[in-house]
Amino acid sequence: MTIGYIIGSATINEATAILEQKIRAGYYVILEYDGDKILGLITNVYTGSPLLDDNLNDVKFVQRIKQLEANKIPFFIKARIKLLCKLDGKFTQPDLPPVAGTPVRLASDEELSTVFSAGDVRIGKLIGSNVEVKIRLNPLSRHLAILAATGSGKSNTVAILSQRLVEIGGSILIFDYHGEYYDSTLPNLNIIEPKLNPLYLSVNEFATLLEIRENANIQYRIIRRTFNQLKEEINNEIKEGKTSLAELNSNFFERLKVKIEEEGRNEKRKESKDEVLNKVEDFAERYSDIIDITFGDVINKIKLGKINVVNLSSLDEDAIDAIVAHYLRRILTSRKENKIKKDSGLKFPILTVVEEAHVLLSKDTNTLTKKWAGRIAREGRKFGVGLIIVSQRPKGLDENILSQMTNKIILKIVEPSDKKYVLETSDNLSEDLADGLSSLDTGEAIIIGNVVKLPTIIKIDKFEGKLSGSDPNLTEEWKRAKEEEIVHSDVSDWG
């Protein structure tokens, strides 16, 4: 059914149509001309009246016009159409613009299915249709950003994507910043404790956690020698059955401090030795909740076909940063090991999800996580490690990392500076699509990148289970607290 006609001048990229009725932005249309069938996307809809145009300066004239019956006031509806591709099986770019008068009609479900339903995993439906949207999985190795304002559907998107991935046997690891997923009803959950085992830390990683920089030569040398010596001793003791992991948990740092004292006996090293001892004591106190030698290697705790969740909600930012950075390092290095020797390391590809990425991957702060997330963004594709970053503050993200997220699922974004930042760091996001981000409803998104053939405006499927991070019902909680207060008061009166 024809809904309008092309008017004015057009290019091979966009055109303007005058419409017979209001059509929401985000709908897909078909233009047929020069023997081709062209798929277009309505990016903007606006109305006006030749009687009440922008040049009108007389308010009394408007009042007189308003006295007419509404259906006697002439008005028009126009739309901007982004021309996407030819529906020729190859989805090539149009090479000729449409001429004025070219009819515009809504695309049929059958036409849209050839473009948007040919992927591997369904995550929703096209806005305004029953056409399911399936994304391609292999391009996720080139990473994904899920960006949105608070309350626009980020957690639901992560839940749906995770659920659909494990349904086909995939593996995903979510760093659960707010505890939304570990206590959810997501299927195939595998909960991993947020623990650090010092025996699996590299010297550089341990020194960084101690805040000893490599250019602090003497301090770095002291910790390198003592840490390596202690790890070797402990590993030998474990092999020979001379100690228990529980015992090591209680005396690891004391043994390390003894070795540091021995290493720093030279008078010239006394000041550096004392500095290292202070830093070890600070480290043991600051990270006491997450240090655990009984924990083992996190690689052995990640399961294939599971939604692996690390619950970080009880930790402070320093501890979260340490955990996420270490796990990302172990995952990347372990996948590299597997590439060289098939029976070692992590034996299957994995997608890692970093929530609150504007905190852990901030453009203004050099976090531990940023180093290893950056490495995965650059190298992960070759070794089957995908990075998914989730944020409600895109402008706070490190530009280099965000620009390497080839794929993006962008839900509602209202803040102009956020939209501008996303546009600047996205090769395949056009300005007209970015302009429409603020008009999206909750759960609606624009998908760009190699996971889809074309920019896709979608309603993400609703996760039907329970996530734990929903906003509290204040009135219900106040009411319940009041009732409990009354009960306690009554019990006290009985006593």
Curated annotation (Swiss-Prot):
The main enzyme category here is: isomerase
* Signal sequence segment: none
Q: Does the keyword Kinase apply?
A: no
Q: List the InterPro entries hit by this protein, alphabetically.
A: DSB_Repair_Helicase (IPR053460), HerA-like (IPR008571), HerA_barrel_dom (IPR018538), HerA_C (IPR033186), HerA_central (IPR002789), P-loop_NTPase (IPR027417)
Record-annotated residues binding ATP?
R142, G151, S152, G153, K154, S155, N156, K459, I460
EC number of the protein: 5.6.2.3, 5.6.2.4
Q: Which reaction does it catalyse?
A: Couples ATP hydrolysis with the unwinding of duplex DNA at the replication fork by translocating in the 5'-3' direction. This creates two antiparallel DNA single strands (ssDNA). The leading ssDNA polymer is the template for DNA polymerase III holoenzyme which synthesizes a continuous strand; ATP + H2O = ADP + phosphate + H(+); Couples ATP hydrolysis with the unwinding of duplex DNA by translocating in the 3'-5' direction
Which Pfam families does the record associate with it? DUF87, HAS-barrel, HerA_C
A single GO BP term for this record reads: DNA repair
Task: Work out whether the entry's keyword set contains Mitochondrion.
Answer: no
Could you list this entry's UniProt keywords, alphabetically sorted: ATP-binding, DNA damage, DNA repair, DNA-binding, Helicase, Hydrolase, Isomerase, Nucleotide-binding
Tell me what turns on expression of this protein.
Part of the nurA-rad50-mre11-herA operon, these genes are cotranscribed.
> What are the protein's GO molecular function terms?
ATP binding; ATP hydrolysis activity; helicase activity
Q: How is its activity regulated?
A: ATPase activity is slightly stimulated by either circular single- or double-stranded (ds)DNA with a weak preference for dsDNA.
Give the highest taxon in the source lineage: Archaea
| Self-association state and partner proteins as the record states | Interacts with Rad50 and Mre11.
The protein's matches in PANTHER family, at most eight in alphabetical order, are given as: HELICASE MJ1565-RELATED
Q: Read off the NCBIfam families from this record.
A: HerA_Thermprot
Family in the record? Belongs to the HerA family.
Protein purpose: Involved in DNA double-strand break (DSB) repair. Probably acts with NurA to stimulate resection of the 5' strand and produce the long 3' single-strand that is required for RadA loading. Has DNA-dependent ATPase activity and bidirectional DNA helicase activity. Loads on either a 3' or a 5' DNA tail for subsequent DNA unwinding; has no activity on blunt-end DNA.
Q: What is this protein called?
A: DNA double-strand break repair helicase HerA
Instruction: Look up and give the organism this protein is from.
Output: Sulfolobus acidocaldarius (strain ATCC 33909 / DSM 639 / JCM 8929 / NBRC 15157 / NCIMB 11770)
Gene behind this chain? herA
